[in-house]
């Protein structure tokens, strides 16, 4: 069960590699169809990276409120929607919009999968499991490039984005069925049915299924103005 979770995280990372570089794989065909200048193409290529940055910055804090599982399901959904929208554009400006949406999803996936992988890996195999997960992005980029060449040759550049949307959508179904919540989130935030969910997880990974939730500790919130980071104290 633990390795299944690691494999799911690696596949998410693999599809991230494909989704992020899909525009690079199809840039020549898109530039030819819409008559783009180098600057316009550069904006499109940057749109996905902008979305990734925004997703990493703004979706990461959301995981502490709603949980890693809902965050990952939402992020994978955004990625699938962005890829699907990219396949049916009629103006290149819309491609920029959908690339931002895809990037948001990819950024959210990146901040969620590393935590899930680390938590569900055994101490003995944790380093190897994280390596497998991390390798997914590069493998997705390499295999995605070869896959994109074949698709474009037969069906055109839009098929690359459509294939990415379909694969990401299938992954979403798999995650919805089998992806568990973060153990740390269940024990620290203690959402509804947290104890039941923890015991189900424990049973699946071969542990005694009689876990009890620890006393919930309320964290004292403290705010530090950003300006203080530039003071002499720091």
Model regions: which residues?
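Transmembrane-helix signature of 12-pass secondary carriers
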Residues: 1-234
């Amino acid at each position: 069960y633990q390795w299944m979770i690691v494999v799911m995280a690696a596949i998410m990372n693999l599809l991230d590699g494909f989704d992020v570089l899909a525009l690079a794989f199809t840039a020549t065909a898109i530039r030819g169809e819409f008559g783009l200048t180098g600057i316009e193409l550069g904006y499109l290529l940057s749109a996905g990276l902008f979305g990734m940055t925004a997703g990493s910055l703004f979706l990461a804090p959301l995981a502490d409120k709603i949980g890693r599982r809902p965050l990952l399901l939402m992020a994978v959904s955004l990625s699938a929607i962005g890829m699907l929208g990219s396949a049916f554009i009629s103006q290149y400006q819309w491609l920029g919009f959908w690339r931002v949406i895809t990037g948001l999803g990819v950024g959210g996936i990146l901040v969620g999968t590393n935590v899930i992988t680390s938590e569900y890996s055994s101490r003995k195999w944790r380093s190897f499991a994280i390596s497998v997960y991390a390798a997914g992005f590069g493998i997705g980029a390499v295999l995605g490039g070869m896959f994109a060449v074949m698709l474009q040759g037969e069906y055109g550049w839009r098929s690359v984005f459509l294939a990415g949307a379909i694969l990401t959508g299938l992954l979403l179904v798999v995650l919805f069925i089998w992806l568990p919540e973060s153990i740390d989130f269940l024990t620290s935030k203690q959402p509804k049915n947290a104890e039941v969910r923890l015991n189900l997880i424990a049973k699946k990974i071969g542990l005694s299924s009689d876990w009890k939730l620890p006393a919930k500790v309320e964290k004292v919130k403290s705010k530090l103005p950003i300006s203080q980071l530039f003071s002499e104290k720091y």
